[in-house]
Amino acid sequence: MFFKTLKEAFKVKDVRARILFTIFILFVFRLGAHITAPGVNVQNLQQVADLPFLSMMNLVSGNAMQNYSLFAMGVSPYITASIIVQLLQMDILPKFVEWSKQGEIGRRKLNQATRYITLVLAMAQSIGITAGFQAMSSLNIVQNPNWQSYLMIGVLLTTGSMVVTWMGEQINEKGFGSGVSVIIFAGIVSGIPSAIKSVYDEKFLNVRPSEIPMSWIFVIGLILSAIVIIYVTTFVQQAERKVPIQYTKLTQGAPTSSYLPLRVNPAGVIPVIFAGSITTAPATILQFLQRSQGSNVGWLSTLQNALSYTTWTGMLFYALLIVLFTFFYSFVQVNPEKMAENLQKQGSYIPSVRPGKGTEKYVSRLLMRLATVGSLFLGLISIIPIAAQNVWGLPKIVALGGTSLLILIQVAIQAVKQLEGYLLKRKYAGFMDNPLETK
């Protein structure tokens, strides 16, 4: 079905242009992800390659951190900045609240504020991570470890992060899907061949013949687990709670009844991306401190281990962030107050529920229940593979396998729905003033 949709999409000029534009942007991103930042000895970086923090950072950067490339920061600073701006709109800063109510003009101001915060965070994060890696490695990761080198690397990585952020915005406007998610999607896909190779090397090379059957059992179990996660995730991400609504007789041209679709997981996969990005922030701060106080400070090491997602405390912290962001982003995606207001303006209502404040409270309660289901689902899918790796000593690629699959599936679902939307537009192009070109 997907390939049929894709084939039909390529027949439409506008859709074809959007697909090719997205592919071009992703090609440029992957090209930049292989250009190592000047002044960095990437071979020595392998000493810290197994750090859980680096794995998480590599995930949210779109697989650009492992080479310490110009795009090593990826969209992580932008994601953190977006969270900050959305929080500031919740009656914290009056100016941001005012902008949030100004429509398109306000949205542009908020986007500009997000860019400025991204710039500051990217600079702080790039210098902090570089200094931290230098402190943790017995070899020089920075070829000339002085403040000029740190500043130069910081400026280069910050510039790269801003370029990647711009790429994401271009995908939003001229391509397919959410730019941030698509960039992370491309990074995950690019890492699949190396992940397969690492499993093959670990399970089938240099092992005793008697261990081969267990290796096959592991691989089959891994494939079956992935299939189950894909099926369950696809089902949950597309499941809806249909709230019946009715129209007053005074509303001309409207049906007598309809329904309001609310997704079982209203927040989608964004909370997982947010949580992954936020978990890198404490590590950045701790690496600043580690650089200034020395690498053998006991309390710093203890705190770093506690916040690492591979430890039980770190797992709980990661799961808690996913739950909190699921509730937060569900109410960002579905605003009960605006929904109640729009229903009232349309002359529609939910049976047995009073219009206005009554509808707002009803939708809020329903959204809380749906967000509870969504948060538990996202948390379990993300945490179970990490716990399995801890308990059974599985290969490290398993740990973030659930998180990676969640992102891959959600981005694929969004892309298919967007394609179907454009094809539906083409189907009814004859009724429009400017039909889509198909040549």
UniProtKB/Swiss-Prot annotation:
<dbReference type="GO" id="GO:0006605">
    <property type="term" value="P:protein targeting"/>
</dbReference>
<keyword id="KW-0472">Membrane</keyword>
<dbReference type="GO" id="GO:0065002">
    <property type="term" value="P:intracellular protein transmembrane transport"/>
</dbReference>
<dbReference type="Pfam" id="PF00344">
    <property type="entry name" value="SecY"/>
</dbReference>
<keyword id="KW-0812">Transmembrane</keyword>
<feature type="transmembrane region" description="Helical">
    <location>
        <begin position="116"/>
        <end position="136"/>
    </location>
</feature>
<keyword id="KW-0811">Translocation</keyword>
<dbReference type="InterPro" id="IPR023201">
    <property type="entry name" value="SecY_dom_sf"/>
</dbReference>
<keyword id="KW-1003">Cell membrane</keyword>
<comment type="similarity">
    <text>Belongs to the SecY/SEC61-alpha family.</text>
</comment>
<feature type="transmembrane region" description="Helical">
    <location>
        <begin position="216"/>
        <end position="236"/>
    </location>
</feature>
<keyword id="KW-1133">Transmembrane helix</keyword>
<feature type="transmembrane region" description="Helical">
    <location>
        <begin position="68"/>
        <end position="88"/>
    </location>
</feature>
<feature type="transmembrane region" description="Helical">
    <location>
        <begin position="373"/>
        <end position="393"/>
    </location>
</feature>
<keyword id="KW-0653">Protein transport</keyword>
<dbReference type="InterPro" id="IPR002208">
    <property type="entry name" value="SecY/SEC61-alpha"/>
</dbReference>
<feature type="transmembrane region" description="Helical">
    <location>
        <begin position="396"/>
        <end position="416"/>
    </location>
</feature>
<keyword id="KW-0813">Transport</keyword>
<comment type="function">
    <text>The central subunit of the protein translocation channel SecYEG. Consists of two halves formed by TMs 1-5 and 6-10. These two domains form a lateral gate at the front which open onto the bilayer between TMs 2 and 7, and are clamped together by SecE at the back. The channel is closed by both a pore ring composed of hydrophobic SecY resides and a short helix (helix 2A) on the extracellular side of the membrane which forms a plug. The plug probably moves laterally to allow the channel to open. The ring and the pore may move independently.</text>
</comment>
<feature type="transmembrane region" description="Helical">
    <location>
        <begin position="269"/>
        <end position="289"/>
    </location>
</feature>
<dbReference type="InterPro" id="IPR026593">
    <property type="entry name" value="SecY"/>
</dbReference>
<protein>
    <recommendedName>
        <fullName>Protein translocase subunit SecY</fullName>
    </recommendedName>
</protein>
<dbReference type="GO" id="GO:0005886">
    <property type="term" value="C:plasma membrane"/>
</dbReference>
<comment type="subunit">
    <text>Component of the Sec protein translocase complex. Heterotrimer consisting of SecY, SecE and SecG subunits. The heterotrimers can form oligomers, although 1 heterotrimer is thought to be able to translocate proteins. Interacts with the ribosome. Interacts with SecDF, and other proteins may be involved. Interacts with SecA.</text>
</comment>
<feature type="transmembrane region" description="Helical">
    <location>
        <begin position="176"/>
        <end position="196"/>
    </location>
</feature>
<dbReference type="GO" id="GO:0043952">
    <property type="term" value="P:protein transport by the Sec complex"/>
</dbReference>
<dbReference type="InterPro" id="IPR030659">
    <property type="entry name" value="SecY_CS"/>
</dbReference>
<feature type="transmembrane region" description="Helical">
    <location>
        <begin position="312"/>
        <end position="332"/>
    </location>
</feature>
<feature type="transmembrane region" description="Helical">
    <location>
        <begin position="151"/>
        <end position="171"/>
    </location>
</feature>
<feature type="transmembrane region" description="Helical">
    <location>
        <begin position="19"/>
        <end position="39"/>
    </location>
</feature>
